Amino acid sequence: MISTERLTHLKQLEAESIHIIREVVAEFSNPVMMYSVGKDSAVMLHLALKAFAPAKLPFPLLHVDTLWKFKEMIAFRDQRAKEEGFELLVHTNPEGVAMNISPFTHGSAVHTDIMKTQGLKQALNKYKFDAVFGGARRDEEKSRAKERIYSFRDKNHRWDPKNQRPELWNIYNGRVHKDESIRVFPISNWTELDIWQYIYLEQIPIVPLYFAAKRPVLEKDGVKIMVDDDRMPIGPDDVIKEEMVRFRTLGCYPLTGAVDSTATTLPEIIQEMLLTKTSERQGRVIDNDSAGSMEKKKIEGYF
């Protein structure tokens, strides 16, 4: 019997995402899910757990660790792996470690390329993954807005924005040549507000950094950077202040700006989202390296 129940907006998004996740597992032999520990990763993990419950996830989670993530992110990552019992793969670019790559010394572009992009490509080559789930959304940034749900990559993991396959309705073409792979974005059609509302309704655990609290911050070039450890270079004129801030997006702490906020609960964050007029990625330094920098990074192999 066909159900006549009308799905709510969030339930429609949930159903679409679960369908995509199951479709990839059915089509590909060695999938993996990227786990960056942010809110989008939290939702994607929740959807994957729902898709295969009560069984365990049929694929591992991969975290490319740059060694510059917030300490709270790493603690939360390990805690979730222990709670849910999923297989967690952690990879750090050994060449970057040997060169002592730092966002402070080498700049955001070099750090992101070596520790993130090259680190990711190393992990994908090592484990021979043929499909990689990512938590990118089309409302985040213009290059992601034009990317397909099934995003094809060549043998060097490069993306060609001019060579994308049509996606008609819910039909996805997963055929790839030898050594090619796809990046899959199950939550492409979600917005930032959808993510927060879903987290609230489903009571999904998230990193405490998303909630406002008194935190030590140092303002650099108009961006408030949280002092997360003693590797932060402090100049003679720099002033560290305790301010009520939170993070709308998470990454390497020297490249992620905090925003002034008093939102300490999920309803307050949602209310803030309804009133804000700025992009959630305004605090991501890597997005401002150059014009069209995100698209260039994706063409080089970045997510």
From Swiss-Prot:
Gene3D superfamilies the UniProt entry points to: HUPs
**Domain of life, per the record?**
Bacteria
Please give the biological process terms from Gene Ontology that the record holds. Answer: hydrogen sulfide biosynthetic process; sulfate assimilation
EC number of this enzyme: 2.7.7.4
Q: Which UniProt keywords apply?
A: ATP-binding, Nucleotide-binding, Nucleotidyltransferase, Transferase
Enzyme class per UniProt: transferase
Q: Which PANTHER family did the record assign?
A: SULFATE ADENYLYLTRANSFERASE SUBUNIT 2
Describe the subunit structure.
Answer: Heterodimer composed of CysD, the smaller subunit, and CysN.
Name listed for the protein in its UniProt record: Sulfate adenylyltransferase subunit 2
